[in-house]
Amino acid sequence: TGPQTXXQAA
């Protein structure tokens, strides 16, 4: 739910 997930760019 955002531009980053687990330090990875979506």
UniProtKB/Swiss-Prot annotation:
Keyword Secreted: yes
Subcellular location: Secreted
Organism: Tityus obscurus
GO MF assignments: toxin activity
Expression sites by tissue: Expressed by the venom gland.
Name of the protein in question: Toxin To35
Record keywords, A-Z: Secreted, Toxin
Main location: secreted
Gene Ontology CC: one annotated term: extracellular region
Bilayer-crossing regions: none
